[in-house]
Structures are given as C-alpha cells and as structure tokens.
C-alpha cells in the first residue's frame, strides 16, 4: 500500500514523478490503515495537463498537481496551506509570508538553521491549538524534515509598501493578506470556508506586519 504519514494524516499516493517519489519516501508509513486522502493523477488528466503546459516536463506537472490536490484536501481536516516559511523557535514556530510582488523570497533573509518548513507548510487545528507541518510537497519538498510539526504562535506578513516597522495587525489589515497567501491553493468555492477557518485561527494566532527581515532576531523576539 502506498501509504504515507503527512501532516498527521494517512495519505495514499500514486505517482510517477521521480521528484515526488524521492521526497515522500521519508514519510512512508510502516503500518496498514484506511487512508484519509488518496492522491492520484489519471493518464487522461496527465495528457490534458501536458497539452495545457507545453514545454513543462511531466515530472514538474505531476509534482505540482499532486501538491495542489494535497492542499485542497487540507480544508477537509481543519487545515489550510499557506505560502510562507515556517521558522522554528524553542517551543513553537512563526510563519513568515511575503507577497510575490515583493520581489524576494523570505528564505534568503532567514538563517537556514531556523527554517523547518519551506514554501508551503500545512497548518492544521488539533485540539485547541494550531500546528504547522513540514511536508514533502512543492518545489522545495526535497528539503523536508520528515513531517515535523510545531505549535503555531504567529504569522508575520512582509510588505515594504505597507509597513514601516514591526506592528501587530488588526483584522482589516491581515484578512486580505492572509487570503492572498492561501489563494493560490484554494478553489473559488472554498473562499467562504477559508474565511471561516481564518475566523477561528485569529483567536489562537497573532498577526504582524513588517517592512523587511533585516532585523530578523529582533522580529523573532517580539512576535
């Protein structure tokens, strides 16, 4: 059985992608269980995607498609995907999110030893807390560290055009920024559900805005 333990879910994965196959190997379950989610790409759908994405390799197409299916499935299990970098602290973690138009990747500003989840960590509610999970999906899935999870304490949005210095955000500021950070991985019909997820999340997690990450240590001490 192609069963893997990812974000505390039993996920059945059928893939021909060499990249994804290598990334998920570390997550393989050593038990048999009914899967919570099954991820697969049919031959017909693969042909359609190849025609729609001329010049893109089959490996990249399948890896991206499976990551998208996984992201969609999170909403069925009290979770969501977010374009961010998860930064580890002593007893919890912080998500650093920056819009594409900022023109830089947060990873270039964060000391590597502090990063435990790259690009698209999964976030799920368990009991009364929220946890960020390292996953094998996405362009940097091969850097995953076998599904670790840490309690999520705050989300920091980096936007040089909006913020001058570190400050805590009110809902009117962070709601559109949060939706933008997850929008790439949600279907239109999930928008209302995503707002419901955010409504619960905001009672457990703090939101901050900052101009840049030049004073990374200071930011981590304050959020």
What is each stretch, according to the model?
Residues 100-114:
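A conserved segment at the C-terminal end of the G1
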Residues 1-95, 112-114, 121-223:
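A noncatalytic interaction/capping subdomain that flanks phosphate/NTP-handling catalytic cores
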């Amino acid at each position: 059985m192609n069963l893997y333990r990812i974000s505390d879910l039993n996920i059945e994965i059928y893939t021909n992608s060499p990249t994804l196959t290598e990334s998920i190997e570390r997550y393989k379950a050593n038990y048999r269980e009914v899967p919570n989610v099954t991820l697969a790409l049919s031959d017909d759908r693969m042909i359609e995607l190849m025609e729609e994405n001329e010049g893109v390799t089959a490996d990249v197409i399948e890896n991206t498609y499976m990551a998208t299916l996984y992201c969609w499935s999170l909403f069925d299990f009290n979770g969501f995907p977010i374009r961010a970098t998860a930064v580890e602290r002593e007893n919890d973690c912080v998500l650093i999110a920056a819009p594409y138009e900022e023109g830089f990747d947060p990873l270039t500003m964060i000391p590597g030893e502090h990063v435990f989840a790259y690009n698209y960590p999964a976030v799920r509610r368990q009991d009364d807390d929220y946890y960020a999970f390292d996953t094998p999906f996405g362009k940097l899935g091969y850097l995953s560290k076998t599904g670790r999870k840490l309690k999520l304490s705050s989300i920091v949005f980096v936007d040089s055009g909006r913020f001058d210095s570190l400050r805590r955000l009110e809902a009117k500021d962070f709601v559109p920024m949060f939706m933008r950070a997850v929008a790439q991985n949600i279907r239109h019909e999930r928008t209302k559900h995503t707002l419901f997820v955010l409504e619960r999340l905001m009672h457990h997690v703090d939101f901050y805005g900052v101009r840049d990450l030049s004073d990374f240590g200071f930011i981590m001490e304050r959020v």
